Amino acid sequence: MARSLVIVESPAKAKTINKYLGRNYTVKASYGHVMDLPKKTIGILLPGEQNGKKKSKRKTKGKGKAVVEKKPVKQVPVTAENIFEPTYEVIPTKLKVIGDLQKAASTAEAIYLAGDPDREGEAICYHLEEILSNPRKYTKVVAEKTAEIAAEADAESEKNGKDGDKPTASAKTTKKAVVQTLARTTAPKIYRVMFNEITQKAIKAAFEHPTQVNVNLVDAQQARRVLDRLVGYKVSPILWDKVRRGLSAGRVQTVALRLIVEREKEVRA
């Protein structure tokens, strides 16, 4: 009999929850967010900003050495409808975690997303649902990301005079997960469960009344993330230029700093 897959944020919770649910459930952790805005670009549709992604191809050249070839893709036109739209991508350090979850999902009877009951937890569940409900698309994404990282690692090894022919351990692990996951082309049913305490009673009640991901909470998290990125990316460089390098601006910290300065001025007046 196939087991149901339960995904929580923290591995510390998994063992206790698994004990309460019993042998018909497998509990795994996402270790927090699995998708985020890109690090190398702003990741938000804005006029004048690069929003196309560069695709990396791992090619073999010469004596079997791997090289990385990057090709720019067409820019997405910014309109009144899509301005400020974020572009999320799989977090590179979560490739193995995602591969493991895809493998578990490929044989699961159902999937229960048990992220924390807040907007961050809802966003994590939303991205997990996106990945696990599109097995063919995201096994390819994971494979391409892993190949890109492996190619960059091989290129770095070659640059440093090391052997760059051997595939990395992460590439081997993910390749195996991809092969196993592609055996299943359709995802099982996916549910959202929430509980405020890790007790048998609370968990049982949550699983008796599963729901769906709350898109309004996801939108709230994305709005916060976009504001954080806009302030950080746009204001921090101005501080570096006008005040001092190394200073940072933030959606909360900059406003808090202004309140402190204004209060200090009142005290000194």
Kindly label every feature range from the protein language model.
Residues 93, 106, 197-269:
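C-terminal or mid-to-C-terminal helical accessory/interaction module adjacent to the motor/catalytic core
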Residues 2-150, 159-222:
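Intrinsically disordered, low-complexity regulatory segments
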